[in-house]
Amino acid sequence: MVGRNKFFHSSPNEPPVSLGGGLQAWRGFYASVRPAHRQLMVNVNVCTTAFYTPGNLAEKMQEFLNMSYNARPNAFARGVRVRTTHLGYRKTVKKVHHALPNQHRFKSEDYGDVTVEQYFKKKYNITLQYPHLPLVDVGGQKANLLPPELCEILEKQPFRGKLLDEHTAEMIKVACKPPNINGAAIINRGIRELGYVEPTDPMRAFGMSVGKEMAVVPGRILPSPNIRYGQGAPRVDERASWNLRDIKFHTGGRLDSWGVLVIIDGNSREEFSSPTDPELLGTLRGFADLCKRSGISMPPREPQIVAAQLPRKDRADPLRKNAVTTIRNSIVKLNPKPSLVLVILSNGDRHVYSGLKHLCDVYLGVATICVQSGKIRKEKGQLQYFANVALKLNMKLGGVNHTLDANNRSSQWLKQEPTMMVGIDVTHPGFGTVSGTPSIAAVVANTDQHFSQFPASMRIQKSKQEMVDALGDMMAERLKAFQEKSKTLPSRILVYRDGVSEGQFNIVVSDEMPLIREAFKKFKTAKGPYSPKLTIVVCGKRHHTRFSPTDAQYAAGDGNPRPGTVVDRGVTAVYEFDFFLQAHGGLQGTTRPTHYYVIHDEIKFSADQLQTLTNDVSYMFARATKAVSLVSPAYYADLACERGRCYLHSLLNGITDAGGTVTSQQAEEDVIIREARGMWKEGVKDPVGRTMFYL
């Protein structure tokens, strides 16, 4: 059992699948009981979780480190249960120490001043095979350092850290199964393994049993909206996507000047060789030409181009701070300061990316768009890649990529009176971060009547606190931005609040809604106090409800429900206003619908009106040419939170200036908050902060 609701059984029919890097994937089942109309329902779903591969800790640590440069020993070993091979004790790894067995010295009663390596040779006649791997601390209050090769990982332990990108790619291959396969697994294995075949004694006492078939619930399919560009109206296909060929943006942005930063980082096979590389110059001309054809006003002058030759990767500098310093020295050479810098990355190094965004957003106030050299220079699919980058560029320049057709019902409703759509999200530090690392809150809202431009307000707050502390101030900032751009205040405000579990809905009503109303009091209208109609909808994707069509005519080609499928009966709340909506077409596996739950409604939506509006706005996500799985304002808030994580990158990777890698016992929360505020500073500098910088 993992957590409260996930169950995994070791079975020859479903053996673990190796993910590489010391981990393996186990497939199991999630189960919970949910109230429904006149009955209880058992919510069962398949689930896949990463477990440690049993074996020698040093071997598995080495496999983990070999899998990616971004891998760090502490991220793998912290919290794992082991058995010591020399004494047979069972211990938990508290952390990975920075010292090596052949360097760390201590005083031994028997042998005097010795290294750990010497001690184990003299005491146990053990010659260490991995003297280059750091020691692990398996002590309690007092440190007890051991070489990892003297520890065996115990079986059946879930991995609670953050998966490497390489692990995630393998995990997707294991976990992604179409709905018919997952449904068969639940019926054929899940019910039996969860013990639902026969009623238990307590269930019999209450006359209860669990059905053997999937519940059938009614649903409907909403039509896709018509999409409008400045030139051309693409057809939305059955997968809720469309093509940008021969399309001009609805409103093109203006780029006054631009620079190009070429990062050179030891990936010579895919990198451009220098700022004067003819292939680079041709690529930039091709990109600029596509931007012009798409409606963006490009500067007549060629861009300034500089290169940054990054220092070699060094485990003594795990976050690559020296590389970021090199990048800074290159960017400041761009003179005069450009409106935007196109950064051509060498690879997907997340430390370089996070450091770059932190530098440019918070310190330099320079807008950036990042591309990877291996993708932008590849001839096959190059125009499509250019177009995808242009989507982001136009939005960062204040343009409008596409809108809903003027005859669309949702479009007409949105323009009946001034309306502001708001997205709110909070992201929290996970396992392996410095204890006390703040959570990050973001609020986005449209400033225009095309519902295209959604600048963001962001704050850090107490670690793992769900309620948004500074919501009043951030809402006031969004209202002021709306007022400046639209020359009026919105009379209706529709909030999509992401990231709230069902048990915390009351926090939004009791704590956050009053803060929103406090923001209203900071504004006045000609008629008196400002009091717009407010509706709050909570969005949730962390649930285990999945749908599978009972009739092929309602199914997409991959067996999932067709885009636009909405369910508001059978598995929804008994007395509340909620629904499940799958606006998007699935990429692979079983598609997850989003659960929308109305917790406050002054606008007085009908079910059909809100469902249709939410579906249509899911087609308004600016950097895509398809409907997205989460309504656009909430999606934007999620992206803004993710950008905020770049600014706290070291703390989120378990490293603090308070003294190396720390645990909760060592890190005082106020010290960490102070360190985080030093990283965050005043947030994103203007004028970058007034744009959709987070795309």
Where are these regions (language model features)?
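Long, low-complexity, intrinsically disordered terminal regions
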Residues: M1-L695
